[in-house]
């Protein structure tokens, strides 16, 4: 395992070195050159330990694993700030994968009378010291990507990221999600996005989950 990780690290460093050289070369041919960060070599022992630490699940992954199972969701949505709430029910099934490194979640429900399905992959990136997440569903063709930090006092993860705004072609909009782990059988997800009229952030969705 250690040899495999070291080999992977060596390949990545080789590719990165070539990229730095390429950036420097191409930059010299242009008037507006991009200043690249100086590459600092890392010895094999340090690189090997870094990859081992990066690949080893820890406490944050164990915390994610506690959410494994099936959850029933009570969903409330708002199409605009101060608008009439719409309610529906949903179901989410969470399962850790790749020896406890990632959690895949499959969601089913309805949106304005139409069947809704979505899937997320969530992980704790040991190198970034952040949670990372992706989301896809049958109501779009893009991928939402967010990163978040754990707040121990609130028992919550606050994710921030970008998602496609199809009403403004070629542009993304800011999105924020707060996952609160109330206890082992109750969780709440709050989602915030821009109001279509003002662009100001407001709560677009809230899902109260109860473990089945």
PLM segments and residue spans:
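Central antiparallel beta-sheet cores of small beta-barrel/beta-sandwich binding domains
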Residues: 74-176
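Edge beta-strand at a domain terminus
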Residues: 186, 191-212
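Residue-level recognition of beta-strand termini and adjacent short loop/turns
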Residues: 98, 181-185
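C-terminal motif of bacterial Sec signal peptides marking the signal peptidase cleavage site
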Residues: 15-16
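N-terminal helix-cap/turn-to-beta initiation motif at the start of protein domains
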Residues: 55-72
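Short, low-complexity, disordered segments immediately C-terminal to signal peptides
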Residues: 20-36
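Sec-dependent N-terminal signal peptides
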Residues: 5-12
């Amino acid at each position: 395992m250690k040899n495999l990780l070291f080999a992977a690290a060596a390949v990545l460093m080789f590719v990165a070195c070539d990229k730095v050289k390429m950036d420097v070369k191409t930059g010299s041919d242009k008037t507006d050159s991009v200043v690249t960060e100086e590459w600092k070599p890392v010895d094999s022992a340090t690189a090997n330990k870094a990859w081992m630490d990066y690949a080893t699940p820890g406490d944050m992954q164990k915390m994610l694993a506690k959410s494994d199972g099936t959850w029933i969701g009570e969903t409330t949505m708002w199409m605009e700030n101060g608008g009439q709430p719409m309610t529906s029910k949903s179901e989410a099934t969470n399962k850790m994968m790749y020896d406890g490194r990632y959690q895949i979640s499959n969601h089913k429900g309805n949106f304005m009378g139409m069947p809704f399905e979505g899937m997320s992959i969530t992980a704790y990136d040991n190198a970034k010291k952040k949670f990372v997440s992706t989301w896809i569903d049958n109501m779009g063709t893009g991928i939402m990507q967010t990163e978040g930090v754990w707040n121990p006092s609130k028992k919550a993860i606050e994710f921030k990221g970008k998602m496609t705004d199809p009403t403004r072609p070629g542009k993304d909009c800011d999105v924020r999600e707060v996952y609160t782990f109330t206890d082992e059988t109750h969780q709440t997800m709050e989602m915030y996005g821009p109001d279509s009229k003002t662009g100001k952030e407001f709560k677009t969705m809230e899902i109260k989950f109860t473990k089945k």
